[in-house]
Amino acid sequence: MCGIAGIMDLSLERVPLLARSLGVMNSLQQHRGPDGEGAWAHPSGGVGFGHRRLSIIDLATGQQPMRDQAGNWVTYNGEIYNYLELREELGLEFFTTRSDTEVILQAYRKWGHDSVNHFRGMFAFALWDEARQTLFCARDRFGIKPFYYTVVDGVLYLASEIKALLPFVPEVETDLEAFKEYLTFQLCLAGKTLFKEIRELLPGHVLIVRNGDIEVRRYWEVYYTLDFNHTNKYFEEMIRSLLEESVAFHLRSDVPVGAYV
């Protein structure tokens, strides 16, 4: 569990006290990442990232926010379980670390916004594309990792937890409609939260900021294919095989792994 934070002026104007604000956001999410803290601010002062790290893979060189050769930056929470396979596919010569964080940067280099379709894992990240002056954010298919954001006076704030956004909201108000939904369904619908000005990036969605506009769109949805051509025994064996494969992927780590029973 790591903590991500980001600030971007939609017009890429200089954000007052950018570095200090990122520090505040990191401090409010310190419990999410006891192993390290990092921050990056663009020279223009119009965009910056923060990060609190819980070290799992590549303890020595996986610090964030992370930069690639093209000047792109990423802040990321989660784990890309198929990162070893993606490293091979993308070309090991492009990598300078063993971190799955760098896989996100190199996948974006090759596939752009379609990179999320290649990831097998749980993730929430924000990536700054220097050449296109674009912010690209994504959340995993099932929303295992959290991602919240708000826009105040033309400035976008994003974080792993709502508490890191509250200092920047001038007037914190309860969204009564979302509150009714929560009491009914135990969740808020359509990306709403219990706070009027704060939104949740839905599972399987990306958020893109370019030319001052924010676009949110779905990149994945669950679908079912009916199959009447195989026996129950076939499906039992297939499910077992898929579960064993999934567990093997989930156990990849550079530190000891535990599980609740």
Predicted feature residues:
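Cysteine-centered catalytic environments shared across enzyme families
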Residues: 1-261
